[in-house]
Amino acid sequence: MNFSIVSIAALLISIWLISSSTISFAQNSRSQNMASQILNNQTLILPKSVRNFVILIPNEAHESPLLPKEQRLINQPYVPQHLFAPPNINIAWFSGDVGHTRKVTLEDQNSETIFDSSIKFNSISPTISFNNSETFSYYEEDANSEDPNFVLNGTITINDPQMQSNNNTSSQSTYEIMSTLMVPTKDIKEYTELLEDNQVDILGQEFFIDLREAGSGGANQTLLVLGSNGQIDDTISVFKKITASLPYS
């Protein structure tokens, strides 16, 4: 009798442990998907509950991929280059392009300019609110003197049906602010601790070899997807600390 009770208890504990591991694996996989989705598809589909998002302008964003020698670190001028977001969201751009002032010109689907802002290195643009369901495009021309035809470009799509049918990042999030950041892999522990100390959580990460590398030495950059619930100014102040300390700053 006692043996049966012990056996049943052991079985229940085993089931609970397996279920917990499965849930944890699913959550981790979903988080990994956000970072890999950006890196592989230049796209991110946000959870519906996010109210603020900061797009990263990465270091060397102004370098053209058509030049003889690759100078970019990541395969897109904005991270993510294509954003699918819920309505009633505020979006801004943070520039990590060392030594350069970037410019963002935003147009609606009628090609009318609705936002135009210059952004100094290690600073954030004014925030713009998006409510209407449509696709907006943004760009910067004349960013590279060696390739005058090169244009930095990205899109923001609000409330697209794709968000309803293909939101593999989860339909809800406990974070009101989400963002992206790129840091050297060798220093990931240092930056992880700084983020955690300031209540900025890592929701996903993807290690990759930057485009300047010849393919040896392994993944030397890490793309982070971040979430927080504090004030956006507090989150950006953490970004500024990290960006100012990066080896290419």
State the predicted function of each range.
Residues 27-30, 35, 42-64, 119-167:
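Extracellular/periplasmic metallocenter environments
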Residues 1-30:
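Secretory targeting signatures
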Residues 177-190, 228:
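Short, surface-exposed ligand-recognition loops at beta-strand->loop->(often short) alpha-helix junctions
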Residues 194-198, 235-243:
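Short amphipathic alpha-helices in soluble, non-transmembrane regions
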Residues 48-88:
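N-terminal edge beta-strand
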Residues 80-100, 104-105, 125-132:
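Beta-strand cores of secreted/periplasmic/IMS beta-sandwich domains, seen most often
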Residues 186-206:
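Short amphipathic alpha-helix segments
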Residues 203-206, 240-249:
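Conserved short beta-strand edge segments in small beta-sheet-based binding/regulatory domains
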